[in-house]
Amino acid sequence: MASTIFVLNGPNLNALGKREPGIYGGKTLADIEAMCKAEAKLLGFDIDFRQSNHEGTLVDWLHEAGEKSVGIAINPAAYGHTSIAMHDAIRAITVPVVELHLSNIHAREEFRHKSMIAPAVKGVICGFGAQSYILALHALKNLTEKSK
């Protein structure tokens, strides 16, 4: 059985494809999940892909992923700018975590420029639309190979 990467998605990402496609693109979260699963198969990983609009649920999943996966890709969405709880949960995890965003958070409103979780993760990928997820999977592949 292949090693598992968790792909966690924060609030409002369930509305992708309908919500501000000029910023987030036209792909739905189901489209992105299918892309991730196909790419992960090529990389030799299984994917556990989840989305929640609730911060506490995401924190619980981070703890679970820290125990059950070889790496985590997380699109925290708006919680990336506000969640000390997610920052602290990531600090407690020993597997690599990559933060990703569909849009370039640094080219948007000033309140989106700072990520509360960026100091706790291995790296941040933003601004490449749905491709940000694929780049995160490749980063995790590289990070897990380095740790062997």
From Swiss-Prot:
InterPro entries per the UniProt record, alphabetical: DHquinase_II, DHquinase_II_CS, DHquinase_II_sf
Disulfide-bonded cysteines: none
EC number of this enzyme: 4.2.1.10
Pathway assignment: Metabolic intermediate biosynthesis; chorismate biosynthesis; chorismate from D-erythrose 4-phosphate and phosphoenolpyruvate: step 3/7
EC top class named in words: lyase
Keywords from the named record: Amino-acid biosynthesis, Aromatic amino acid biosynthesis, Lyase
Positions bearing the site annotation: Transition state stabilizer: 19
GO biological process terms on file: amino acid biosynthetic process; aromatic amino acid family biosynthetic process; chorismate biosynthetic process; quinate catabolic process
Residues at the catalytic site: 24 (proton acceptor), 101 (proton donor)
Catalysed reactions, as listed in the record: 3-dehydroquinate = 3-dehydroshikimate + H2O
Molecular function GO terms recorded: 3-dehydroquinate dehydratase activity
Binding site for substrate: 75, 81, 88, 102-103, 112
Function statement: Catalyzes a trans-dehydration via an enolate intermediate.
Record's subunit section: Homododecamer.
Similarity comment: family membership: Belongs to the type-II 3-dehydroquinase family.
Name of the protein this chain belongs to: 3-dehydroquinate dehydratase
Annotated source species: Sinorhizobium medicae (strain WSM419) (Ensifer medicae)
Gene behind this protein: aroQ
